[in-house]
UniProtKB/Swiss-Prot annotation:
It is an enzyme of class 1 (oxidoreductase). The gene is iolG. Keywords: NAD, Oxidoreductase. GO terms for biological process: inositol catabolic process. GO terms for molecular function: inositol 2-dehydrogenase (NAD+) activity; nucleotide binding. Its EC number is 1.1.1.18. Involved in the oxidation of myo-inositol (MI) to 2-keto-myo-inositol (2KMI or 2-inosose). Homotetramer. It comes from Klebsiella pneumoniae (strain 342). Pfam families: GFO_IDH_MocA, GFO_IDH_MocA_C. This is Inositol 2-dehydrogenase. It catalyses: myo-inositol + NAD(+) = scyllo-inosose + NADH + H(+). Belongs to the Gfo/Idh/MocA family.
Length: 337
């Protein structure tokens, strides 16, 4: 039986997920779509193969009798509202990051889900489904390079718009590292420090770019993450793990190497959707399969909360030159099953 999905938000990522669920994945059908811009919703349901009803409001999608599960891909500040509504309706919900705009908002979702008595929330952190990150985690978990001592990472975007601000380098960009590095190391953050090097001439008045974000984990691993969102040359994700007996690096995306005109070159991607397109497919297929099986296993509301707690500390650290403590409570047994 096909899982019937309702999608709230039909912008870039919402439309892409609707296409993915309709044309690529198995076992699900999009039956309801809403967007604050009705034209976006109508364009999404006009995609080949989509046969869905357009609703004026996200709550109408959640409450529709023929909708089994929800995808929240709307404007970030609405994520908490719609996720809580889905929990209240007893419907599994896949919420794109961020889960909420603050750690307090994420905690409200965690508390509501625990009160419901079963996992209903998966957060759209796709990197744990990426083949490269999975291979890197296996190296670490198998002890092939000994205990991880240091990590050097980078998250680089070609450019961002005038509405992108200094704090968004944390909440919209670094948020992926905040999740995937916890997962990669099976460790939590103890403290964070943010430094600003010389600023690129390609930024604007409301954005300090690049930023260097440095963490110490509870096990003592040191992590440096470069966040550079106007790097100009492409979309580039790097992760190097220095262990006791060796070094492991996140593999580069597959690309043709060219020798031409006295030069050796390899193309670099410019679109984040292309860099993790397979991971997006795998994470949503896993959500569909898990909902149908009655048990979610993907990134949880607690993972969303943990990332948000770290993000709040990072934003606080942007305003001081000193390290800031990351205070994450003990993970409830509910999320350790």
């Amino acid at each position: 039986m096909s899982l019937k999905l309702g999608v709230i938000g039909a912008g870039a990522i919402g439309k892409e997920h609707i296409r993915r669920c309709t044309q690529v994945l198995q076992g699900a059908t999009v039956v309801a779509v809403s967007d604050i811009n009705a034209d976006n919703a109508r364009a999404a349901v006009a995609l080949p193969g989509v046969q869905a009803e357009v609703y004026a409001d996200g709550h109408d999608v959640i409450n529709a009798s023929d909708v089994d599960a929800i995808l929240v891909t709307s404007w970030d500040p609405t994520h908490e509202e719609y996720t809580l509504a889905a929990i209240a309706a007893g419907k599994p919900v896949f919420c794109e990051k961020p889960l909420a705009m603050s750690a307090e908002g994420c905690r409200r979702i965690v508390d509501a889900e625990m009160k419901a008595g079963r996992r209903l929330v998966q957060v759209g952190f796709m990197r744990p489904y990426d083949e490269g990150y999975l291979a890197l985690k296996k190296v670490i978990d198998d002890g092939d390079i000994g205990a991880p001592l240091m990590l050097r990472c980078a998250h680089r975007n070609q450019s961002v718009g005038e509405n992108y601000t200094t704090d968004m380098a944390i909440t919209n960009t670094l948020i992926h590292e905040l999740d995937v590095l916890r997962w990669l190391l099976n460790d939590d953050y103890r403290s964070v420090q943010v430094r600003f090097p010389r600023s690129t001439s390609h930024t604007h008045a409301r954005l300090k770019d690049p930023q260097i974000v440095s963490f110490e984990t509870k096990k003592g691993t040191l992590i440096d993450v470069e966040v550079f969102v106007n790097c100009q040359y492409g979309y580039d994700i790097q992760c190097e793990v220095v262990g006791e007996t060796g070094i492991a690096r996140l593999p580069e995306p597959s690309a043709v190497q060219m020798r031409k005109s006295a030069s050796l070159s390899t193309a670099i991607l410019t679109d984040w959707k292309d860099r993790f397109i397979k991971a997006y497919d795998v994470e949503l297929q896993a959500f569909i399969n898990d909902v149908k099986a009655g048990q979610l296993h993907g990134p949880s509301a607690w993972d969303g909360y943990a990332a948000s707690v770290a993000a709040d500390a990072c934003i606080k650290a942007q305003g001081t030159s000193e390290p800031v403590e990351v205070t994450l409570p003990e993970c409830p047994a509910f999320y350790k099953r």
